[in-house]
């Protein structure tokens, strides 16, 4: 849809303010998309005359049409609260009630099931799946890894700007070292070829882009899993490679899960959940797993403990014990 000049100005302000406040690109795009949908639904009303009533009507329509789950509704509420507060300078969405999100038992895989799914993946996608399971990475964290974040000597990965803009360290599975070294070597060769043809740039964090404007050409800052095609960085106009798009990995994992024959839903996030479950079952305490997972709240980690307890994972049925004794 084509927005009015006024609406476009407010949307541009929203983008700028999200960047200034160091929101991730993913959150920025999501928030702006919700603001666009809201403005589109009330296109006949001038932006400066929109109120909380318009927001509640927008959310109610989407909810009654069955197109808005509680989690998405809360996301939309946060996005529109930011739009009103920061772009419009009005805080009338303060303390707007949130939808109650249902708590589901997380779907996890056994080690054998993980191997079945990984066995259906190949190349960089198998390596990505192995990192999500072996180090507990989120899909976005695995995609955003840069060459400098991998320490082969210490067997350590630095996760930069994870969820909540927090850095953390996770284990690098020794089993993945050879494959990761080969991937980095391919990235180095590709970067040299790109630089010879006028490319080779990797988008930098805002602060570094100002302090070291040429660092984006260095191998250390290249993405470990770059996109197959180069493009222009919208912030600098320089040609280079961004990281893989999430949809490409999600598509490959979905196909692999289907081919493996596992009768349960499997997504990229299932690898990470399975990591947490396996670590807890192995006897690691919840606080240690919380740090590895990058959970800001221990209660998030405890959902995995609860899932293990509720499902009786690791316990033995009295029928099995009796059978073994006999």
Walk through the language-model features, giving the residues of each:
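Conserved catalytic core of the tyrosine transesterase superfamily
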Residues: 1-326
């Amino acid at each position: 849809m084509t927005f009015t000049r006024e609406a476009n100005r407010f949307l541009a302000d929203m983008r700028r303010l999200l960047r200034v406040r160091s929101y991730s690109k993913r959150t920025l795009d999501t928030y702006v998309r919700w603001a666009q949908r809201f403005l589109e639904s009330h296109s006949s009303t001038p932006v400066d005359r929109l109120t909380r009533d318009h927001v509640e009507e927008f959310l109610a329509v989407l909810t009654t049409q069955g197109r808005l789950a509680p989690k998405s509704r809360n996301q939309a509420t946060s996005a529109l609260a930011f739009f009103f507060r920061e772009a419009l300078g009005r805080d009338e969405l303060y303390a707007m009630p949130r939808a109650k999100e249902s708590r589901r038992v997380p779907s996890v895989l056994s080690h054998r099931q993980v191997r079945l799914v990984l066995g259906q993946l190949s190349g960089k996608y198998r390596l990505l799946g192995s990192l999500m399971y072996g180090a507990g990475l989120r899909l976005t964290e695995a995609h955003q890894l840069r060459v400098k974040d991998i320490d082969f000597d210490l067997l350590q990965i630095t996760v930069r700007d994870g969820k909540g803009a927090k850095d953390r360290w996770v284990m690098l599975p020794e089993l993945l070292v050879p494959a990761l070294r080969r991937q980095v070597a391919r990235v180095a060769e590709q970067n040299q070829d790109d630089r010879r043809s006028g490319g080779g740039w990797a988008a930098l964090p805002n602060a570094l882009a100002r302090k070291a404007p040429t660092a984006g050409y260095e191998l250390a800052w290249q993405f470990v899993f770059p996109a197959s095609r180069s493009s222009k960085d919208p912030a600098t106009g320089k040609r280079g490679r961004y990281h893989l798009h999430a949809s490409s990995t999600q598509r490959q994992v979905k196909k692999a899960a289907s081919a493996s024959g596992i009768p349960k839903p499997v997504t990229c996030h299932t690898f990470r959940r399975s990591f947490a479950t396996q670590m807890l079952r192995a006897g690691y305490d919840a606080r240690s797993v919380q740090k590895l997972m990058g959970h800001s709240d221990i209660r998030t980690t405890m959902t995995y403990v609860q899932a293990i307890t509720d499902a009786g994972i690791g316990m033995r049925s009295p029928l099995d014990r009796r059978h073994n004794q006999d």
